[in-house]
């Protein structure tokens, strides 16, 4: 068999990432969509489809229907999220379908390019809006030192494969993993992954592993 070229590997890598991203946002109870750096919308959850996209056939069609000022504001927010220390930009009082929303845009850089996660929080729900803005101002955007050396294992690879990629011993990989799980109260990797996917903390970690594997 012929070895895949870099373009083919990048395409497969992007497909895996977008699939994981789609699964992660499907758990959320507020509208979320994902746009790639080329301006195309690649994912949305059910809440977005029902509350934001509504009668339009696609996210792109919905976005094209917005007023120019609104489109520029949201596109500019993507750019500003890239330069933000937390990778997040928040726009308040965006009027969509006669409802005011806070739109929180988070940028995630991967070897394939930038992905932008758009979160829509109903302004009338002050408690939820404040919680989400606070969460994405303080939550982990880049994996902490606690993950260094065991990143591949944390997202699903075996200790043997992970330790070989990270150039550490299997024993050290297991000890560091046990220490991390014990500190945060996880009895298994399954429970760890369940929590990470539901809270979307898996996304920056996944991007980090993609970077490691691409070296």
Curated annotation (Swiss-Prot):
Keywords: Activator, Conjugation, Cytoplasm, Plasmid, Transcription, Transcription regulation. Its main location: cytoplasm. One of its GO terms (cellular component) is cytoplasm. Signal peptide: none annotated. InterPro entries: TraJ. It comes from the Bacteria. It is found in: Cytoplasm. This protein is essential for positively regulating the expression of transfer genes that are involved in the conjugal transfer of DNA between bacterial cells. This is Protein TraJ. It comes from Escherichia coli.
